[in-house]
């Protein structure tokens, strides 16, 4: 399974000494290729010891887009509400991320606390769910860009990662994943005792920006120092 997952992932291999890993998941309809240049930019800022892995989501039907098949971590039925995600599909995609984590720990000998998971939009949602579902693996941290917590109405953070750092960034002009959804998800997690920061970027829509990349870089460099 891991060979197939890694074969279908974009991996930055030009590193000095591999002592840390960032696993970053793309949004709906995108691919890992859409983020590898951003990861290379972050790596170039004195983060040559970090390997960046950008996995590709499975191709599956998305109700929101009339059943059209596209890269998707799980089905999305509507943009009007949250919490109607398919638990089985969310868990299947969580298993993909967990398989990569296990590979980095066992084959690359990277300690769990030297691994950050993160993503954009649906990939951010998957990362939040995966991060706070861990009961045996204490990771380094989590990054969620323009994201939200899936299955939020049923989700309870029962995780070793409650004390680990979370960075959530959301634009206040996001018309796809509303800013309020991200903030509500953060508040829900915060009420359960997680250690995190929510940053609002003025004028930012449903995309990234140089300011956001700067914030990501600082978080990654601080969490995964040489």
Swiss-Prot record:
Reaction equation(s) it catalyzes: S-hexadecanoyl-L-cysteinyl-[protein] + H2O = L-cysteinyl-[protein] + hexadecanoate + H(+)
Gene Ontology molecular functions: carboxylic ester hydrolase activity; palmitoyl-(protein) hydrolase activity
Keyword Chloroplast: no
Active site: 121, 174, 206
Record keyword Lipid metabolism present: yes
UniProt record, GO biological process: fatty acid metabolic process
Record key words, sorted: Cytoplasm, Fatty acid metabolism, Hydrolase, Lipid metabolism, Nucleus, Serine esterase
Protein's cellular compartments: Cytoplasm; Nucleus
The organism's place on the tree of life at top rank: Eukaryota
InterPro entries xrefs: AB_hydrolase_fold, LYPA1-2/EST-like, PLipase/COase/thioEstase
Family: Belongs to the AB hydrolase superfamily. AB hydrolase 2 family.
Function: Hydrolyzes fatty acids from S-acylated cysteine residues in proteins with a strong preference for palmitoylated G-alpha proteins over other acyl substrates. Mediates the deacylation of G-alpha proteins such as GPA1 in vivo, but has weak or no activity toward palmitoylated Ras proteins. Has weak lysophospholipase activity in vitro; however such activity may not exist in vivo.
This protein's name: Acyl-protein thioesterase 1 homolog 1
Record organism: Dictyostelium discoideum
């Amino acid at each position: 399974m891991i060979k197939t997952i890694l074969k279908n992932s974009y991996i930055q291999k030009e590193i000095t000494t591999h002592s840390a890993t960032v696993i970053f998941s793309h949004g709906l309809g995108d691919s890992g290729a859409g983020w590898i240049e951003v990861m290379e930019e972050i790596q170039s800022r004195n983060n040559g010891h970090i390997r960046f892995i950008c996995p590709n989501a499975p191709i599956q039907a998305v109700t929101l887009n009339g059943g059209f098949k596209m890269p998707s971590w799980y089905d999305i039925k509507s943009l009007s509400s949250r919490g109607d995600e398919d638990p089985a599909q969310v868990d299947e995609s969580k298993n993909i991320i967990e398989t990569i984590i296990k590979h980095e720990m066992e084959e690359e000998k990277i300690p769990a606390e030297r691994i950050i998971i993160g993503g954009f939009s649906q990939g951010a949602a998957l990362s939040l769910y995966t991060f706070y579902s861990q009961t045996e693996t204490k990771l380094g941290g989590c990054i969620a860009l323009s994201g939200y917590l899936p299955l939020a109405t049923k989700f309870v953070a029962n995780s070793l990662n409650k004390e680990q750092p979370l960075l959530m960034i959301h634009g206040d002009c996001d018309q796809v994943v509303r800013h309020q959804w991200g903030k509500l998800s953060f508040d829900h997690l915060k009420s359960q005792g997680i250690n995190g920061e929510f940053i609002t970027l003025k004028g930012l829509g449903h995309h990234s920006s140089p300011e956001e990349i700067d914030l990501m870089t600082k978080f990654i460099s601080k969490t995964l120092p040489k």
